[in-house]
Amino acid sequence: KIDGTIQNYERLDWPEKSEAFWQTVESLIPNLEHLDFTGGEPFMIAQHFDLLEKIVKMDKAKDISIHYNTNATQLPLHALKNIWPHFKYVDVHFSIDGLGKHFEYQRHPAKWQDAVANMSVFKEYNSRKFDLRICHTVDIFNVFYLPEFLDWSSEFGIPVYLNNLHEPKYYNVSTIPYLSLIHISEPTRPNT
């Protein structure tokens, strides 16, 4: 976002390998208001941390907010401790679409306990200038586990927002027969 206007630029190349991309972004620093880093996994792109450090050195960080979507498989401790505190606001949204073995299936070779440990470290830095959320994209693979997921996230202490998968349509929950979906909203009853 520059001067109140959201900018969409033609993709120059895969950012990690494109010097032109980083030069273009650096030229925009004086007017930047917001940076949005989304997946793949933005914490694996070292150049973006270099960019943030340049912004801090230019004394522009206090005017810029940052948003991340991450899968919680990486823990950027240096940024947590030394870079992000300089920025106006940082929000990190963890893309978590399942628990335990469901997470590991979707994010192979990631390990659930590692992701939970990483999110726990992030929670230590939660503040008015640093906010955490879990984005749970609901699809045909995880909709039946939604109550369990919401219970876990409430206990874990990071707010969740639900995102409905739209594409591909055959993974959208609207393809599930109505009678099957009813079971999701019914509380579990003991056998009597």
Residue locations for each model-derived region?
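Core AdoMet radical
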Residues: 1-17, 29-46, 58-78, 85-117, ...
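Alpha-helical packing segments of well-folded alpha/beta enzyme cores
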Residues: 21-24, 51, 115-118, 149
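N-terminal cationic-hydrophobic initiation segments that often serve targeting/anchoring roles
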Residues: 26, 56-59, 84, 123-126, ...
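Distinct, well-ordered alpha-helical segments
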Residues: 49-53, 76-84, 145-147
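Catalytic cores of alpha/beta
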Residues: 141-154
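PAPS-dependent sulfotransferase catalytic core
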Residues: 170-181
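Single conserved hydrophobic/aromatic residue that forms the stacking wall/gate
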Residues: 182-192
